[in-house]
């Protein structure tokens, strides 16, 4: 079985409209994980499409100008069903988090401001879960777009 602790094997995509949050995330986790960042949902979707086979975990803020985080998570689920999806919410956005959990669009939600040690564990467990799923069925790693080739 492949090493589940090779956390750089698959990338983490973090989407947030706050530049400071993107910078803090990259600084906190860049040594342990391969990181992509995007400043809005549309940019995040573009990165997902361009790097679909590289990204194992998507973490997105809910409240952003334009499309919301749940919108991106739903598209990610269609593009790459096995991708681990994490929603970042403020306490005021708990209804969105509950709806996302209930619809099956997310693996977990994280509240803002996030706690680095706790978030590190969430990212590690999420990537481990992704790697187990992929190792059991490599064809599941690819989303519906791969079947159109």
Model-derived features with residue positions:
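Short amphipathic alpha-helix used as the core "switch/output" element in two-component signaling
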Residues: 46-49, 70-84, 99
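The feature encodes the CheY-like receiver
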Residues: 65, 89
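Amphipathic alpha1 helix at the N-terminus of the CheY-like receiver
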Residues: 20-30, 47
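Acidic, metal-coordinating helix/loop segments flanking the phosphotransfer/catalytic sites
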Residues: 37-57
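Active-site T/S-Asp motif of two-component receiver
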Residues: 59-61
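C-terminal output helix
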Residues: 95, 114-123, 127
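Non-catalytic signal-transmission and effector/linker regions of two-component phosphorelay proteins
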Residues: 1-13, 23-26, 54, 124, ...
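Alpha4 helix (beta4-alpha4-beta5 surface) of REC/receiver domains from two-component response regulators
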Residues: 71, 92-109
